[in-house]
């Protein structure tokens, strides 16, 4: 991507619509993801379930691991940086990743400021729990939004909450008179121009994917029914009993989310799903979705 204009960045993200992006930690996993039909992979040293289990500070992955994954597949490769850590983003841009995820899954580097994403040619995806968060990230230059969900839990409830909240707030914006939009923009802390765009178009100005806790084909199809453009699957595939089969099943579930017969077929005989976490058991400081603002 020679030109880093916003239209080119958002156009690139549009190409992922209707697809599945999978977390991978090795070139072998990346090949499994590509063969299963993933539209892109997210290169990581540890999947969110392991980051959650091991604790400590989670940082950008070793560039060597990311480069090995990039060499193994022909589909786009994404990688994560800490919230606010623009130097990690500079490193990823230098090694040629296709997309950067400024991610709450990693330990935030800055608790007040997100990265100024306009300064980069490479496009960014960011998490959001509601319309205000989404529009702030887009104002900073994000070319793609995803729900935050609660990564590494295998529990889809937070992703569902964030998706429903986003659409509820979009519908509310549409119900406002034009002379009420400025006050609402102030209330949610988002630029007026973006609030007006949402009012006029009834959706976000960029692609919006589901992420965080998606573990089964049914979970993935549920998020598509809730109006998402596609799905990120993290720990749910390679922490399960039969990753190859589950990866293929989730890709088919997203493509055929409206066909219960296909969903029933792809949900059969997938082996053990990842062990999930009931969110009631999480301490407040263990919740990743509240990172960022």
UniProtKB/Swiss-Prot annotation:
Its UniProt pathway annotation is: Cofactor biosynthesis; pyridoxal 5'-phosphate biosynthesis
Could you describe the subunit structure of this protein? In the presence of PdxT, forms a dodecamer of heterodimers.
Q: Which Pfam families match?
A: SOR_SNZ
Protein name, UniProt field = Pyridoxal 5'-phosphate synthase subunit PdxS
The UniProt family comment states:
Belongs to the PdxS/SNZ family.
**Residues annotated to bind D-ribose 5-phosphate:** 23, 152, 213, 234-235
The record describes the protein's role as: Catalyzes the formation of pyridoxal 5'-phosphate from ribose 5-phosphate (RBP), glyceraldehyde 3-phosphate (G3P) and ammonia. The ammonia is provided by the PdxT subunit. Can also use ribulose 5-phosphate and dihydroxyacetone phosphate as substrates, resulting from enzyme-catalyzed isomerization of RBP and G3P, respectively.
Q: What is the catalytic activity of this protein?
A: aldehydo-D-ribose 5-phosphate + D-glyceraldehyde 3-phosphate + L-glutamine = pyridoxal 5'-phosphate + L-glutamate + phosphate + 3 H2O + H(+)
Source organism per entry reads Thermus thermophilus (strain ATCC 27634 / DSM 579 / HB8)
| PANTHER family from the UniProt entry | PYRIDOXAL 5'-PHOSPHATE SYNTHASE SUBUNIT SNZ1-RELATED (PTHR31829:SF0)
Q: Name one GO molecular function term.
A: pyridoxal 5'-phosphate synthase (glutamine hydrolysing) activity
Annotated keywords: Lyase, Pyridoxal phosphate, Schiff base
Cite the binding residues for D-glyceraldehyde 3-phosphate: 164
**InterPro entries assigned:** Aldolase_TIM (IPR013785), PdxS/SNZ (IPR001852), PdxS/SNZ_N (IPR033755), RibuloseP-bd_barrel (IPR011060)
């Amino acid at each position: 991507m020679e030109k880093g204009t916003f239209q080119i960045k958002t156009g690139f993200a549009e190409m992922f619509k209707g697809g599945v992006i999978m977390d991978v930690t090795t070139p072998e996993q990346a090949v499994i993801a590509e063969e299963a039909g993933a539209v892109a992979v997210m290169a990581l040293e540890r999947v969110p379930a392991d980051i959650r289990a091991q604790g400590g500070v989670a940082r950008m992955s070793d560039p060597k691991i990311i480069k090995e994954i990039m060499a193994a597949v022909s589909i786009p490769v994404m990688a994560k940086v800490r919230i606010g850590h623009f130097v990690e983003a500079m490193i990823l841009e230098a090694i040629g990743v296709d997309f950067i995820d400024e991610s709450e899954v990693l330990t935030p580097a800055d608790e007040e400021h997100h990265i100024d994403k306009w300064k980069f040619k490479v496009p960014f995806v960011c998490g959001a729990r509601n319309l205000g968060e989404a529009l702030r990230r887009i104002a900073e230059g994000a070319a793609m939004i995803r729900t935050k969900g609660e990564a590494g839990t295998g529990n889809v409830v937070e992703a569902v909450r964030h998706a429903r909240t986003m659409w509820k707030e979009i519908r509310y914006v549409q119900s406002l008179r034009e002379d009420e939009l400025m006050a609402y923009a102030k209330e949610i802390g988002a630029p007026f121009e973006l609030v007006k765009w949402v009012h006029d178009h009834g959706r976000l100005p960029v692609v919006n994917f589901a992420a965080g806790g998606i573990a089964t084909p049914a979970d993935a199809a549920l998020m598509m029914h809730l109006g998402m453009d596609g799905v990120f699957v993290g720990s749910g595939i390679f922490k399960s009993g039969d990753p190859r089969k589950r990866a293929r099943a989730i890709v088919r579930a997203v493509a055929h989310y409206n066909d219960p017969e296909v969903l029933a077929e792809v949900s059969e005989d997938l082996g053990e799903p990842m062990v999930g976490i009931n969110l009631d058991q999480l301490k407040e400081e263990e919740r990743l979705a509240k990172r960022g603002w």
